[in-house]
Swiss-Prot record:
Organism for this UniProt entry: Solanum lycopersicum
CDD domains per record: HFD_H2B
Molecular function in Gene Ontology: DNA binding; protein heterodimerization activity; structural constituent of chromatin
Protein name (Swiss-Prot/TrEMBL): Histone H2B.1
Organism superkingdom: Eukaryota
Matches recorded under InterPro entries: Histone-fold (IPR009072), Histone_H2A/H2B/H3 (IPR007125), Histone_H2B (IPR000558), HISTONE_H2B_site (IPR055333)
Entry comment describing in which tissues the protein is expressed: Ubiquitous. Highest level in shoots, fruits and young flower buds, including petals, anthers and ovules.
Family: Belongs to the histone H2B family.
Keywords per UniProt: Acetylation, Chromosome, DNA-binding, Isopeptide bond, Nucleosome core, Nucleus, Ubl conjugation
Length: 142
């Protein structure tokens, strides 16, 4: 391309003048004029929190039945919740194993009852079986 006739060749300026010209060009705009980073996020739907199922309310209800005057700390409640999850996981694994051994496609109350007898020790297993039987009877009668 040929240079335009109206343009003059660029003049060389001293270094100090160049620095003085660059500083105003680098100024940041005022904070009031900036758009917030989340301006576009208002249009998007907010993620709903994942609901986590816990046994905390049931633990608390049982505690109040047994000892109405005693409370429980949140850390202790978390430990109890983990304990119940672990026990239920062991019972589920054992009942699943029993169903597989007996070549049954379904886990019934009988597999659960046998798993309780295998997983829980002595007297605790007896009480759990009697309470479980009572709960199943109550459920089927309604």
């Amino acid at each position: 391309m040929a240079p335009k006739a109206g343009k003059k060749p660029a003049e060389k300026k001293p270094v100090e003048e160049k620095k003085a010209e660059e500083v105003p060009a680098e100024k940041k705009p005022k904070a009031g004029k900036k758009l917030p980073k989340d301006a576009g996020a208002d249009k998007k739907k907010k993620k709903s929190k994942k609901s986590v199922e816990t046994y905390k309310i049931y633990i608390f209800k049982v505690l109040k039945q047994v000892h109405p005057d005693i409370g429980i700390s949140s850390k202790s409640m978390g430990i109890m919740n983990s304990f119940i999850n672990d026990i239920f996981e062991k019972l589920a694994q054992e009942s699943s194993r029993l169903a597989r051994i007996n070549k049954k496609p379904t886990i019934t109350s009988r597999e659960i009852q046998t798993a309780v007898r295998l997983v829980l020790p002595g007297e605790l297993a007896k009480h759990a079986v009697s309470e479980g039987t009572k709960a199943v009877t109550k459920f089927t009668s309604n």
